[in-house]
C-alpha cells in the first residue's frame, strides 16, 4: 500500500516498522526487483549504518525502514530534516493504541510527525484494528484521514509474473492502463 506511492513521489519514503526481521524481509524483496531500499536498525555495524546514511543524504534511496524508537531519536530526525521525505508510512499502526496487545509508547510519539513535517503525507496501515483502535490511530497520527477497511477475503487480488525491465515505467503503465479508474 505504501510502496507504490513511495516510488511515484520524489524523495525517500520513511517506513516505520516494529520488527527488524520484517524490515530485512521487505528490503531484500525490494532489492530483488531493483528498488533502492535500506534500513537503519541495531543489526547494522557502525560502518553499515554510515553507508545507509550516506545513501540517504545523497538521494539514492526510495524507501528507508526504521523502528519508531530510532525515528524518534533527535539524531534521526535531524538527519531526515536534511533530505526530501516523500511520505511517512506507519506499518503495524495498531501499536499506537494503548488498548492494543502490541502497544509501544514510541508509536504514540509519532504524533510529532504531524507538526515537524506537516507537508509530508502520512499513511497508517494495520490488519488488526477494531473501530476504537482505528479512531485512536487517526487521532494520533493522521489529519482528515480516509479509512479503507476490507475483509481478509480479497477476490480482486490475483498474481501475475512479469519480467522486470524498467520498474517505475512498468508500474506507471500498470496503474494507467489497468487501474485508471480505481
Q: Residue locations for each model-derived region?
A:
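Post-DEXD/H (motif II) to motif III coupling segment of the RecA-like Helicase ATP-binding lobe
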Residues: 81-149, 168
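Conserved nucleotide-binding/hydrolysis micro-motifs of P-loop NTPases
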Residues: 20-22, 44-46, 69-72, 94-95, ...
Amino acid at each position: 500500500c505504501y510502496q507504490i506511492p513511495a516510488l511515484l513521489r520524489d524523495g525517500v519514503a520513511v517506513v516505520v516498522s516494529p520488527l527488524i526481521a520484517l524490515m530485512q524481509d521487505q528490503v531484500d524483496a525490494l532489492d530483488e526487483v531493483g528498488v533502492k531500499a535500506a534500513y537503519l536498525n541495531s543489526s547494522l555495524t557502525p560502518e553499515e549504518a554510515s553507508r545507509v546514511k550516506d545513501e540517504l543524504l545523497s538521494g539514492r534511496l526510495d524507501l528507508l525502514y526504521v523502528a519508531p524508537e530510532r525515528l524518534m531519536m533527535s539524531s534521526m530526525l535531524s538527519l531526515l530534516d536534511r533530505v526530501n521525505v516523500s511520505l511517512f508510512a506507519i506499518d503495524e499502526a495498531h501499536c499506537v493504541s494503548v488498548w492494543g496487545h502490541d502497544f509501544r509508547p514510541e508509536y504514540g510519539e509519532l504524533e510529532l510527525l504531524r507538526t515537524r513535517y506537516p507537508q509530508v503525507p502520512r499513511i497508517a496501515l494495520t490488519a488488526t484494528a477494531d473501530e476504537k483502535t482505528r479512531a485512536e490511530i487517526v487521532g494520533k497520527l493522521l489529519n482528515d484521514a480516509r479509512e479503507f477497511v476490507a475483509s481478509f477475503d480479497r477476490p480482486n487480488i490475483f498474481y501475475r509474473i512479469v519480467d522486470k525491465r524498467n520498474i517505475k515505467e512498468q508500474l506507471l503503465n500498470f496503474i494507467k492502463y489497468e487501474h485508471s479508474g480505481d
